[in-house]
Amino acid sequence: MQNTQTPSPMPFGKYTPFQDQIRVELPDRTWPTRTITKAPRWCAVDLRDGNQALIDPMNSERKLRMFTLLVQMGYKDIEVGFPSASQTDFDFVRTLIENDLIPDDVRIQVLTQAREHLIERTYESLRGAKQAIVHLYNSTSVLQRRVVFGMDEDGIVDLALQGARLCRKFEETIPGTTVYYEYSPESYTGTELEFAARICNAVVAVFEPTPERQVIVNLPATVEMATPNVYADSIEWMSRHLDQRENVIISLHPHNDRGTGVAAAELGYLAGADRIEGCLFGNGERTGNVDLVTLGMNLFSQGIDPQIDFSDIDHIRRTVEHCNQLPVGERVPYGGDLVFTAFSGSHQDAIKKGLEAMERDAAAAGKTVDEIPWAVPYLPIDPRDVGRSYEAVIRVNSQSGKGGVAYLLKAEHQLDLPRRLQIEFSRVIQERTDAQGGEVSAAQIFDVFSDEYLPSGSGTPEWGRFALRGTRSVSVVDGADTLEVDLHDDGAENTVRGTGNGPIAAFCAALGSRGVDVRVLDYAEHALSAGGDAQAAAYVECAVAGRVLWGVGIDHNITTASLKAIVSAVNRALR
């Protein structure tokens, strides 16, 4: 097949390929053959990196609500602000400490640049904390060295070392606080690997890590510049070249400029990282930080404990939307409104069959559905595991098929339609969606179903020619039933009789006396609920006046439900 694409008018030539800027070469890489088997250490940076990117930054109420959510979910490293750069951030850190709002197993993290007055102010904000992470950073990339700082490599290293030494100096002013250190060569992805290793090793040496007080070396994709495999190669290279590796925690901080932040984080973790920083639902500058929800739930979907509680995803999303004053998109993985929803007919049919197979397999094993491995097409996880119901899994529009319509009727109204009735009714819904457009809700589907197959509540004219008023079995002779039927026929009340092999055949004969030729072709029934007073649903396929149509009847008496279903089919044929 010929490729008919043509050159675009876009000025792509003004951009330099990444490999021509930074060389990342690791021919003996080992990360591609590794498998993730456990959760990394997590650090939530919603209150700092996420907050700085908001149109309306969080006030104290929203900050506290976000912090409370992160603690409840199980995050143990939480970056809470940049106290030297903002009085609001400083006051928030003090509020957390002075009101004893930080659990003993949670480490707050604060950010600072490598300047003395900023570092001093940072330590002032931490006074009284049990433990804290001081996160020191300075930019190291080729571009920023040239256009922002006007410094060579030695000047950038000196700046970082000055900051590290000042941190150690001011650490002495808060002797009651256990201080851990984190260092970030900001713009790491635009930094030569040899220089990144040089500056990180120099800073780590000043911080003097031990097994009990490891140093975090954070390697941020401040701007995502290449494919995720390149980031992973750089992480494995750094892991090999960092001094005192056993006392160093390699942390990742991916951004999503190229749309591959999650992939970069996962591959970087495979490549030797120990920790990942990000935000809930990927908030952050430009296209956002890596999404901690997606990362955690990806682990969960592989049978790995994320060590974070996502069991009420809608509460998490509502809180994040309130705090950030930004919506979470409908298609955002795991948390969006539509992520567990199928509109496609073939997808709906596969989901319906998958859920039914799960129920059969569980029953055969003598277990509940939750006790057997999840295996449903198009649903990577059970929506109930994150607090969702199955109500929104299948939704109907013009692209939907019989499987989705049938699933909603069964899930919402316990109506288990026979296959040919599913096909027939899906055509009715298709006509409705083609004519009106948009989505049809489960409630609207049932309304259409009722209008089509069940008696209306406003009288017989809208329903059809016949209405069943009552039946009496008159006699049974030689296996043949004679049935007396009270029938409303086109505005008049009539009593007719019919004889046949069973009540259904007798009823068809009674209708014959009114000039209606009806034959039953197929029949199905089931209870709508458990218990002695449960209603039953009957589905009858009939040939009436040269047409083959289904009818539906619902009644506490299964025989009456069957006769109502015949009336339903006849009325539909005669409308």
UniProtKB/Swiss-Prot annotation:
UniProt main location, coarse: cytoplasm
MF GO annotations: 2-isopropylmalate synthase activity; acetyl-CoA C-acetyltransferase activity; magnesium ion binding
GO biological process terms held by the UniProt record: L-leucine biosynthetic process
Swiss-Prot/TrEMBL catalytic activity: 3-methyl-2-oxobutanoate + acetyl-CoA + H2O = (2S)-2-isopropylmalate + CoA + H(+)
Cofactor (UniProt): Mg(2+)
Highest taxon listed in the record's lineage: Bacteria
Domain Pyruvate carboxyltransferase: 40-314
Binding annotation for Mg(2+): D49, H253, H255, N289
Subcellular compartments: Cytoplasm
InterPro entries tied to this protein: 2-isopropylmalate_synth_dimer (IPR013709), AIPM/Hcit_synth_CS (IPR002034), Aldolase_TIM (IPR013785), IPM_Synthase (IPR005668), LeuA-like_post-cat (IPR054692), LeuA_allosteric_dom_sf (IPR036230), LeuA_N_DRE-TIM (IPR039371), PYR_CT (IPR000891)
Associated pathway: Amino-acid biosynthesis; L-leucine biosynthesis; L-leucine from 3-methyl-2-oxobutanoate: step 1/4
Alphabetically ordered keywords of this record: Amino-acid biosynthesis, Branched-chain amino acid biosynthesis, Cytoplasm, Leucine biosynthesis, Magnesium, Metal-binding, Transferase
PANTHER family tied to this protein: 2-ISOPROPYLMALATE SYNTHASE, PTHR46911
Name the record gives this protein: 2-isopropylmalate synthase
Organism: Kineococcus radiotolerans (strain ATCC BAA-149 / DSM 14245 / SRS30216)
Organism classification: Bacteria, Bacillati, Actinomycetota, Actinomycetes, Kineosporiales
Protein's gene: leuA
